[in-house]
Amino acid sequence: MGTNDALTSTEDAVTAGANDAPLPAPPEPPRKARRATSRTSDFRVAEQPAYVLHSYPYRETSLIIDVLTRDHGRLALVAKGAKRPHSALRGVLQTFQPLLLSWSGKSEVRTLTGAEWVGGMLPLGGDGLLCGFYANELLVKFCAREDPQPPLFNHYVLTLTRLAHGEPAVQVLRSFERVLLRETGYAMALNRTVARRAVEPDRRYVFDPERGVRNADDEVPSHWPVISGQTLLDMEQDDYHRAQTVAQSKTLMRFLLNTYLGGTPLATRQILIDLQNL
């Protein structure tokens, strides 16, 4: 499958890895995202399952790493000395690899005290790598700091595993996007309308970003994409074997993600557009 068909919500592309060109500074999460309390405490956490989403230089020899952890949500950690040539952290703090991280501190940016590579994850390549960078960017933009979301963490691991094994990127990404929206407060059923009527496969609908599925015959903004009932039912079941469902689900998710991000562009999308223009 080609990259154009695989990547969604902006036809994404490769973005920076853990030690490559940085992503833009993460914006505030969308307004519906659940926010953790502002309380911080001086504590130590040992051997927490985690993945590096992104990193950027800090001072001369260190890195700030943006990580997704299983039980503590998304965090920023300072990895002191990680840029030094002989640092043991250089080869460990890589994206898409399962880690056990330890940290301490009471500030918003905690101090990394240990990092262990767990292993067992196949490396991503080709379209799978592009999709992985796309998933990381969505997590950075949608997830509030210190908001534990174990189901989202587990689905992220599943997403990487499926991509590494070469499963169709279209289905893998659509599934990830829906879980991401659900866990960050945007979940709405696709099999029932806002009037609580069952979606019919032969009818035409639109998706109101604030309310859910509505009849296409209603008075709605013209830029809302029209989606068949069959596509909505297929998406509810995570079924993407129909060509129409593949095309319409991509259009719908692009529209919803763009709306919830307030029109903020994704770096992965622009990189792919630039590559296609070569």
Swiss-Prot record:
Query: What Pfam families has UniProt attached to this entry?
Result: RecO_C, RecO_N
InterPro entries tied to this protein: ARFGAP/RecO, DNA_rep/recomb_RecO_N, NA-bd_OB-fold, RecO, RecO_C
Q: Which domain of life is it from?
A: Bacteria
Ordered alphabetically, the record's keywords are: DNA damage, DNA recombination, DNA repair
Q: Does the keyword Ribonucleoprotein apply?
A: no
Q: Has UniProt tagged this entry with the keyword Cytoplasm?
A: no
- Compositionally biased region (Polar residues): 1-12
Identify the SUPFAM superfamilies for this entry. ArfGap/RecO-like zinc finger, Nucleic acid-binding proteins
Q: Which GO terms describe its cellular component?
A: bacterial nucleoid
Please list the GO biological process terms of this entry. DNA recombination; double-strand break repair
Question: Region labeled Disordered — which residues?
Answer: 1-42
Q: Which protein family is it in?
A: Belongs to the RecO family.
Q: What does this protein do?
A: Involved in DNA repair and RecF pathway recombination.
Q: Which PANTHER family match?
A: DNA REPAIR PROTEIN RECO
What is the recorded name of this protein? Answer: DNA repair protein RecO
Taxonomic classification, please? Bacteria, Pseudomonadati, Pseudomonadota, Betaproteobacteria, Burkholderiales
